[in-house]
Amino acid sequence: MRCPFCRHDDTQVVDSRVSEDGAAIRRRRRCPACDKRFTTYERVELALPSVVKKDGSRTEFDRRKIVASMQLALRKRPVAADAIDAAASRIEYQLLGSGEREVRSERLGELVMNELRALDTIAYVRFASVYRRFEDVSEFEDVIEEFRRTNAPPAAPAKPTRKR
């Protein structure tokens, strides 16, 4: 690696260790030409897909927007900030795992809804009402009914009957 001070082409690694969060390798380097030391960090470069909006325009994926929209839906709900962060990470991992270069904003909204559904029912309905642009109460009822249908507990097994 090139020295940032004297521009010498070859530096020596003096110390390497994993960063506290485990997401990077911290390296202390020394330049043999000027004898100065500096620190570098080695991280994995993740290429998240760009987002294709409804109007066809494209923008970079922004995790902060995902977190902000989830926080808004979860406002005054008993959900920890760590749970929101973990949900945003799961969305990122799903996008990375897809291998696609672009994701439609509609798909991103569905991923957020799925995460909110698992975190908090009220937040899920709140987000759905804005995301799907509800115009009347029947649309709320439809979402709630769908939620009840898909999240209904399994039916209790029938009790055996005795023969007399």
From Swiss-Prot:
Superkingdom classification of source: Bacteria
InterPro entries: ATP-cone_dom, NrdR-like_N, RNR_NrdR-like
PROSITE patterns: ATP_CONE
Span of zinc fingers (unnamed): 3-34
Span of domain ATP-cone: 49-139
Alphabetized UniProt keyword annotations: ATP-binding, DNA-binding, Metal-binding, Nucleotide-binding, Repressor, Transcription, Transcription regulation, Zinc, Zinc-finger
Any GO BP annotation: negative regulation of DNA-templated transcription
Cofactor note text: Binds 1 zinc ion.
GO MF annotations, alphabetized: ATP binding; DNA binding; zinc ion binding
The protein's required cofactors: Zn(2+)
Record carries keyword Metal-binding: yes
Protein task: Negatively regulates transcription of bacterial ribonucleotide reductase nrd genes and operons by binding to NrdR-boxes.
Record family assignment: Belongs to the NrdR family.
NCBIfam families: transcriptional regulator NrdR
Entries under PANTHER family matching the protein: TRANSCRIPTIONAL REPRESSOR NRDR
Protein name per the record: Transcriptional repressor NrdR
Organism listed in the record: Paraburkholderia phymatum (strain DSM 17167 / CIP 108236 / LMG 21445 / STM815) (Burkholderia phymatum)
Gene behind the chain: nrdR
